[in-house]
Amino acid sequence: MSAPIVDAPAAEIVYKIISSDGVVSKMSEKAVQQSKTLSNLIENLGYTIENIETRDPIPVTNVNGKTMAKVAEWCEKHKADAIPEDNMNVLKTLTIPEWDQKFLKIEDEALFDLILASNFLDIKGLMYFGCKTVSNMAKGKTTAELREIFGINTDEQDAAEETAQRAAAEVA
Amino acid sequence: MWPRNDVHMDDGSMTPEDQEPVTDNDMEYNDNGEESSYSNGSSSSYNADKLSSSRPLQHKLDLSASPSRNNDLNPRVEHLIALFKDLSSAEQMDAFTRLLQESNMTNIRQLRAIIEPHFQRDFLSCLPVELGMKILHNLTGYDLLKVAQVSKNWKLISEIDKIWKSLGVEEFKHHPDPTDRVTGAWQGTAIAAGVTIPDHIQPCDLNVHRFLKLQKFGDIFERAADKSRYLRADKIEKNWNANPIMGSAVLRGHEDHVITCMQIHDDVLVTGSDDNTLKVWCIDKGEVMYTLVGHTGGVWTSQISQCGRYIVSGSTDRTVKVWSTVDGSLLHTLQGHTSTVRCMAMAGSILVTGSRDTTLRVWDVESGRHLATLHGHHAAVRCVQFDGTTVVSGGYDFTVKIWNAHTGRCIRTLTGHNNRVYSLLFESERSIVCSGSLDTSIRVWDFTRPEGQECVALLQGHTSLTSGMQLRGNILVSCNADSHVRVWDIHEGTCVHMLSGHRSAITSLQWFGRNMVATSSDDGTVKLWDIERGALIRDLVTLDSGGNGGCIWRLCSTSTMLACAVGSRNNTEETKVILLDFDAVYP
């Protein structure tokens, strides 16, 4: 990064990120630092304050636009936060702040995509909150409740369905 | 799906009906056409075109359809779906709403079952394993057991050792490997005329259980060792709390005498007696290994060194003797005390002994050398604790003294008790001392405080002598000659629970597991308590002679075994040690 102009405050860089489906999201420089993958990508591809305006958006081919928008929103909210230590014990003592609890109160499909994205983009804070959210869905539940919450058949039901499909295939 | 199949069957089986449905479809189609023209007045020409093009197509299908196709498709449903596809998203939503209003609850429930999976995700099966592990990392062992029952995939992920290893110390309590406890005295049981063990397994079930006990490492251990460890620890806890007692034994010795002291180290049990001897027993084999002969007076106190190599005993003959656990040989006789050796404590190979001669002496048991004499008490020393540097002693002079073991200097004298001090606890890390006295009170001291201000709590409520105490964190458990167990918060200085049930003096106490305390009593019983709920869990041993002289003098325990020293002062009960087994195998 170049030195800021002496007489004017440095403008913060805003990066454009293009997702797998062609949707463009924006993230500030500070927000991007929450993601080790994005930070490395920006550095390796040579995006700078001088050339950012003239270059194509940063390509992230593993994440769709809807999910990337959520990621960007989370990173902007937490851009001033320290990145949590890479330590399993952090997870045990972690409590999810209220804003994040609301942010993560989304459908399973969206939460699933968000956790995958946080893993790919190496956003530890979001990954921990996402995993903790799923943990909290499972905590203190009976086996039957777990199946109902996560939409999982018993192995017997799966076996019966497979048998039925095989029988149907033979008839056809 | 099923109702639709049903309709199909009806359709296919009635040839005369084939014509009527066609007629019905035509009528319904006209109705829908009318509706369409109402809701889309501006595009009536388009609808008219649709109508004219659809009609011939439907007609063609009707004429050319084979009987099997007729069975597969319900023309009315197909028409409905075709119309539905032509609707806008908003129109579809309106149609859904109105269809639901026309549906019965059975169909609505089936509809929910079809829809719900669209909103659910099987996270553990679909996420990368390392993320699944992060999710499971937050769960308790109990939760993990439930997770394992959900599906094959969940079971595989839930059994990854790293997840179980990460459980906290509270959950992942380590026990020594499973024991045999089927030979020697274990071949019988402790159940006998005059001895009741209320929840003991029936004799006819013992042989099967003994066989199963020897299968020490099961299937789960082979594929998920740490889960197996968790399950075993959980089983052991249940064995103490609720399960039938699956094994017991009687160690007979010290006939017609009192067992005055008892210690356990790993698999070694040492009992001392006023018959002038100590016996060294192998717990798992259920047999005596050595009888330590040499004292010329009753043995009143003993210790096993932390390394397990030395047994030390104190006697009315004024001597301290050091014995080898390897072969029971006498290594040293330590002389110097001028009266009964009444109490002792060890740290490493350094021993501190307290005596009726009012002094404490410091020894090295390896070399047999006398290192220091601590003068200061004005009456018998009754109890002592030692952390390797600091000695804490309580005496019949009503005081508790703090000493430096190396210099022999008395650092502090704690005054406040107005009768003899009988029991002590010392927690070195916090400089906390708890003392129990015949004045009925328990005092909690912090001797780093300014002189005269050391007493941080005065615990009152007991009405007699406190015979034993144990402290964890801020919770102190005390047992007393008044027949009660009390649970205290030493930070608040309050009594949290009073546990009643014994009918005479409590002689000993053992705290194991998270919240379980066992107590022995002059009333001839051993009771197990839950000190968190403040309730009796169950009686473990009951002597018929209780109340007539039979008593339980002392308890010792490991995490899987309880030893009870039994006897009487009037020969109504033979002297023996009853062992109860609470062990379990790795599933």
UniProtKB/Swiss-Prot annotation, chain B:
Disruption phenotype: Worms show a weak masculinization phenotype. Moreover sel-10 mutants suppress the egg laying defective (egl) phenotype of the sel-12 mutants. RNAi-mediated knockdown results in increased zyg-1 expression at centrosomes. One of its GO terms (cellular component) is cytoplasm. Residues 1-11 have a biased composition (Basic and acidic residues). Expressed in tail and head neurons. Residues 1-53 are annotated as: Disordered. Residues 17-34 have a biased composition (Acidic residues). Pfam families: F-box-like, WD40. It is found in: Cell projection, Axon; Cytoplasm. Residues 35-47 have a biased composition (Low complexity). The keyword Cytoplasm applies. Signal peptide: none annotated. Residues 121-167 form the F-box domain. GO terms for biological process: cell differentiation; female sex differentiation; negative regulation of centrosome duplication; negative regulation of Notch signaling pathway; regulation of Notch signaling pathway; regulation of protein stability; regulation of vulval development. Probable substrate recognition component of SCF (SKP1-CUL-F-box protein) E3 ubiquitin-protein ligase complex, which mediates the ubiquitination and subsequent proteasomal degradation of target proteins. Regulates synapse elimination in early development in the motor neuron HSNL. Cell autonomous negative regulator of lin-12/Notch-mediated signaling, with respect to lin-12 activity in cell fate decisions and tumorigenesis. May target the intracellular domains of lin-12/Notch proteins for ubiquitin-dependent degradation. Involved in sex determination by promoting female development. Probable component of the SCF(sel-10) E3 ubiquitin-protein ligase complex which includes skr-1 and F-box domain-containing protein sel-10 as a substrate recognition component. Interacts with fem-1, fem-2, and fem-3. Interacts with the intracellular domain of glp-1 and sel-12. Interacts with lin-12. Interacts with skr-1. Interacts with zyg-1. This is F-box/WD repeat-containing protein sel-10. It comes from Caenorhabditis elegans.
